């Protein structure tokens, strides 16, 4: 009878033969959270709060939380930029979220921008 550990070992041998390596658990968490939140339409910076709330459910230490937040941004940036059109005045407030990750200190730098575009 084959067990899951035998299947896992055969998968690892297959990965090694191809020169591949299995995906890291933190990257899998970040990809699943980013994919879950990418389908929604957000207003203002609600997408950032939603991603942080979803990552908070995994009880990650601060260094891993910061890295997962950066990996979410790299995997799918749909939740980082929102366009909020005001149809009456032809004004677009574009909310942009940027995050940079320092691998040595495991710290993130977050920047929030609001770009106002007026069309006459």
Swiss-Prot record:
One Gene Ontology term, aspect cellular component: viral capsid
Protein name: Putative 15 kDa capsid protein
Main location, first listed in the record: virion
Keywords from the UniProt entry: Capsid protein, Virion
Compartmental location: Virion
Lineage: Viruses, Viruses incertae sedis, Naldaviricetes, Lefavirales, Baculoviridae
